[in-house]
């Protein structure tokens, strides 16, 4: 039975990757609905993205930068950087607006009670920092997914790709699984789930006036 499962994973790595993500995604939904401990939420999020993230890191880490320069057109080169700048500008603008809101909220909530100002500030930061981090993570995921498209394409198991031959050259079955799991759509979907679910897993903010 173990041999059969291993063979199936080798032949259809993307299908198994999607199934893995769906199982832990469903478990995450149940955990959120039943209000389980936050550590369980983070554990499920980590397990959900584990296969595609590890595979993506292995593929992109093995691919030299010269490969991307050879594959990129002038348009794609500037378009990806444009998207990165948009995400960066949005994150900066959000930090400025939220920073002003934090200052005002602390003053209003504390009502000249200096001993509570620091505590309120930390509570607000526990909400703001995860939101900004999630936005930057989303930008990182989109950029890596774009690189994956350029390196290995959209096929489940590409017959011709630009992944360096030295990546698991002596273990073709493992190479097939890694390249299959490093699918741009799978990595983008699971990565964006983290960007959406991550801030909510930190907890909700409650300030008593």
Task: Report each predicted region and the residues it spans.
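Cytoplasmic membrane-interface regions of multi-pass membrane proteins
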Residues: 1-6, 56-81, 142-175
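Membrane-interface segments at the starts/ends of alpha-helical transmembrane spans
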Residues: 34-44, 77-78, 110-133, 167-179
């Amino acid at each position: 039975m173990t041999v059969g499962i291993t063979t199936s994973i080798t032949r259809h790595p993307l299908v198994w990757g999607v199934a893995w993500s769906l199982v832990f995604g469903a478990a995450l939904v149940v955990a959120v609905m039943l209000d389980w401990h936050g550590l369980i939420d983070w554990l499920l999020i980590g397990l959900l993205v584990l296969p595609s993230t590890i595979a993506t890191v292995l593929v992109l880490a093995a691919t030299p930068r010269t490969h991307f320069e050879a594959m990129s057109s002038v348009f794609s080169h500037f378009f990806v950087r444009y998207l990165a700048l948009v995400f960066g500008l949005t994150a900066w603008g959000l930090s400025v607006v939220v920073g002003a809101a934090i200052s005002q909220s602390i003053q209003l909530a504390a009502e000249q009670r200096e001993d509570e100002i620091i505590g309120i500030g930390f509570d607000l930061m526990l909400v703001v920092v995860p939101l900004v981090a999630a936005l930057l993570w989303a930008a990182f995921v989109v950029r890596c997914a774009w690189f994956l498209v350029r390196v290995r394409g959209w096929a489940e198991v590409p017959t011709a790709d630009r992944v360096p031959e030295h990546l698991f050259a002596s273990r073709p079955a493992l190479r097939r699984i890694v390249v299959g799991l490093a699918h741009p759509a799978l990595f983008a979907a699971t990565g964006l789930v983290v960007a959406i679910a991550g801030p909510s897993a930190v907890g909700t903010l409650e300030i008593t006036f």
